[in-house]
């Protein structure tokens, strides 16, 4: 008797996400950009709090730090700079999406792209924009969006709101 998985079920990963927030900056850029997201309950997701009941920081990218691997004696670099947040569920109310220039290696501004997508029942774009960060500690509100009781985005704006200041001295 041999137990084998059905071929059509191998490698299947059931991931649940209602919204995806993607923050990216130029490939191979050494700076560390962070995403901070506040949900309607006031919980803030960021690199020190990677999981709430509603949101998860799927990828925390630190620029070029730890982007090299040795595979078969060859040094391989991952050029992609990207942070990803999944909203596995949603709570009605306002969400705030901020980007933070956590570590800078150059004086030139870094263009940071923020994209918010609603995934269900079909993929739709909630927000897309590019923001320039030009110094360590610079925090910018990319988007604030409100979800109604059915999970539909009803309004989007970029009225500034600091989330870092709410996190206290640890930040």
Label every model-predicted segment.
Residues 1-171:
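Intrinsic-disorder/low-complexity signal
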């Amino acid at each position: 008797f041999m137990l084998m998985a059905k071929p059509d079920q191998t490698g299947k990963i059931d991931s649940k996400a209602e919204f995806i927030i993607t923050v990216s900056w130029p490939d191979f850029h050494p700076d560390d950009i962070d995403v901070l997201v506040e949900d309607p309950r006031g919980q803030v997701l960021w690199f020190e709090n990677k999981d709430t009941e509603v949101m998860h920081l799927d990828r925390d990218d630190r620029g070029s730090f730890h982007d090299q691997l040795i595979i078969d004696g060859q040094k391989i670099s991952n050029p992609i700079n990207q942070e990803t947040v999944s909203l596995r569920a949603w709570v009605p109310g306002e969400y705030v999406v901020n980007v933070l220039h956590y570590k800078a290696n150059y004086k030139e501004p870094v263009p940071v792209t923020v994209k918010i997508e609603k995934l269900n029942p079909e993929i739709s774009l909630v927000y897309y924009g590019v923001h320039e960060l030009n110094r360590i500690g610079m925090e910018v509100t990319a988007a604030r969006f409100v979800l109604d009781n059915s999970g539909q985005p009803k309004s989007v704006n970029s009225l500034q709101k600091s989330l870092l200041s709410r996190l206290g001295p640890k930040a």
